[in-house]
């Protein structure tokens, strides 16, 4: 999927890509694989150099983009080390949730909306455990269906990354650049040249 506008503002291409990375892209292109200059546009097919999330010469995360700007809002509260125990419905509308913090349970009423961000595995698990999902599968598990949404828990795809380790002659690599005097050069480049 395409990156959001907030996130896209900080996406940048590498300023000094490694010569072997460029060669890899050219080689892939020479055997028919298309070059992809912006895999954050929604099209992830092809060979590409990694894009980075950098703001003011520092790594910029999803937390920096979305979470930190709203931490001080009155209608937002971040709970850490908290487990969502149960979602309570009133006529298919979420009324409240029961959370667990340590050994304590607490009921929180929902005014407008609940945003569930528990990851690729836990989000559908929480929904299904609370009756949101494929009605037939929920019935098999003895879970009362509150909302029949067959897509919940479906279409999870892994993104495989294969690391290739090779020795090179007459070409420095990230491994050789992270040792000895080369490491000092890289530290200098980072702190003073912002590379």
Q: What is the role of each PLM region?
A:
Residues 116-141:
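Flavin (primarily FAD) binding-site architecture
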Residues 103-113, 117:
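Core beta-strand elements of the Rossmann-like FAD/NAD(P) dinucleotide-binding domain
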Residues 37, 79-80, 116-117, 145-148:
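General beta-strand structural signal in soluble alpha/beta enzymes
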Residues 10, 134-195:
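Mid-to-C-terminal "cap/lid" subdomains and adjacent gly/pro-rich loops that border
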Residues 1-94, 100, 163-187:
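Conserved redox-cofactor binding core of oxidoreductases
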Residues 72-75, 91, 103-105, 132-148:
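Secondary-structure transition/capping motifs at alpha-helix termini
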């Amino acid at each position: 999927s395409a990156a959001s506008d907030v996130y896209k503002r900080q996406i940048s291409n590498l300023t000094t890509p490694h010569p072997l990375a460029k060669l890899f892209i050219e080689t892939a292109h020479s055997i028919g694989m298309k070059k992809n200059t912006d895999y954050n546009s929604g099209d992830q097919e092809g060979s590409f150099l990694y894009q980075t999330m950098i703001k003011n010469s520092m790594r910029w995360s999803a937390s920096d983009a979305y979470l930190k700007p709203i931490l001080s809002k009155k209608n937002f509260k971040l709970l850490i080390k908290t487990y969502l125990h149960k979602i309570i419905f009133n006529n298919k509308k979420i009324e409240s949730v029961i959370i667990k913090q340590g050994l304590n349970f607490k009921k929180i009423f929902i005014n407008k909306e609940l945003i569930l961000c528990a990851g690729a595995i836990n989000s559908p698990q929480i929904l299904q455990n609370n009756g949101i999902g494929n009605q037939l599968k929920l019935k098999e598990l003895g879970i009362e269906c509150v909302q029949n949404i067959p897509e919940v828990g479906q279409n999870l795809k892994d993104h495989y990354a294969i690391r290739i380790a090779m020795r090179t002659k007459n070409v420095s690599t990230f491994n050789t650049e992270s040792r000895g005097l080369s490491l000092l050069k890289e530290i200098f480049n980072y702190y003073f040249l912002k590379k």
